[in-house]
Each structure stands twice: as structure tokens, then as C-alpha cells.
């Protein structure tokens, strides 16, 4: 959709008006200890009959790579505008909204990959108190200190009207439909 200039969130909302359609909300990838892992057991056991499962998992895994690439483009643009090294706020680390579980989290993978590649990352995860790899910031702190914003998880806190308005104003990269 992005390549064609189509707003995926509007497209999903429109399609879901049909009574027999229920398109799920895409995100920065698929995580958790079940859906992200268990299909690979089926693929390993019967690869010939699990081609669709393999393809689905590969497509979902690539979504995380695509999100990282989009963030890198935004960082390069911000750097070109300011001449400084931009700080990236990764909003959400959990594998799904409003939980403290980071197992197989695509959001955590994105933040960690950016950090490992030398990007200045500030992490916001309202459902945990600390993380071994990141110093956590509040949403307010991140909104004040960062230059590029990536909404990776649709946490309730990020949906608050003032937060949502600020993310729209800051032209946040929205990988989960908060600003749509």
C-alpha cells in the first residue's frame, strides 16, 4: 500500500464495513511465544504441505525488516535537515498492546537492531519497570527528547487524545494504526 500511496488503515477500515470481512490490524510484525514460533514446528515436520505457512511467517518476519528500513529513512531525513544525530523514540517493546510480555517481540527486535547499528534509541514501554538493554523513558520524556518517533505497539497510553495528537503533529511513523 505504501508504494502506491494508499493509506492501509483507511483501506482496512473501509473493507471492514462489509459484514463478512474482518481484516485484522497489521503491526510491526508478529510476536509472542505461540504465533511467532509454533508454525515453524509444522513447517519443519512437513515442509511440502506447509508452504503457505512458511510463506506467511516469512512475510510477517519481513514486516519487521521493512519497519527498520522505514525508521532508518526517517532518521536520515532528520539528520539531513538538522545536521545532527537524531534520537529515535521506539514507542512500545511488548509483543502486543497493554501487556508486559516481550517474548519474540518484533518491537523489541526493532529497537535492539537500531541500537546495535549505532542509532540513538530511547525506549518507551509503560508496562515494564526496567530492561537490561534500554534505559526506559516515559512517553512525555520521549516526546520532548526524540527527533524520530516509531509507534511500534498500540498501547492504550499512546491512544490517549493528547498523546495521539502530539504523535500526529510530530509525524510519527505509525506501524500499528494509532494516528489513523
Give the residues covered by each predicted segment.
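Structural/interface elements that position substrates and couple domains in central-metabolism enzymes
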Residues: 1-180
Amino acid at each position: 500500500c505504501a508504494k502506491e500511496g494508499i493509506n492501509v488503515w483507511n483501506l482496512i477500515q473501509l473493507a471492514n464495513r462489509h459484514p463478512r470481512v474482518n481484516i485484522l490490524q497489521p503491526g510491526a510484525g508478529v510476536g509472542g511465544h505461540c504465533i511467532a514460533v509454533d508454525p515453524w514446528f509444522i513447517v519443519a515436520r512437513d515442509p511440502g504441505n506447509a508452504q503457505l505457512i512458511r510463506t506467511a511467517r516469512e512475510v510477517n518476519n519481513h514486516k519487521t525488516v521493512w519497519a527498520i528500513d522505514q525508521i532508518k529513512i526517517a532518521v536520515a531525513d532528520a539528520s539531513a535537515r538538522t545536521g545532527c544525530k537524531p534520537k529515535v523514540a521506539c514507542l512500545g517493546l511488548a509483543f502486543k498492546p497493554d501487556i508486559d510480555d516481550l517474548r519474540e517481540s518484533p518491537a523489541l527486535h526493532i529497537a535492539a537492531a537500531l541500537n546495535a547499528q549505532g542509532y540513538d534509541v530511547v525506549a518507551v514501554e509503560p508496562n515494564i519497570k526496567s530492561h537490561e538493554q534500554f534505559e526506559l523513558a516515559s512517553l512525555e520524556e520521549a516526546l520532548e527528547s526524540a527527533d524520530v518517533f516509531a509507534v511500534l505497539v498500540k498501547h492504550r497510553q499512546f491512544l490517549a487524545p493528547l498523546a495521539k495528537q502530539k504523535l500526529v503533529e510530530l509525524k510519527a511513523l505509525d506501524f500499528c494504526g494509532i494516528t489513523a
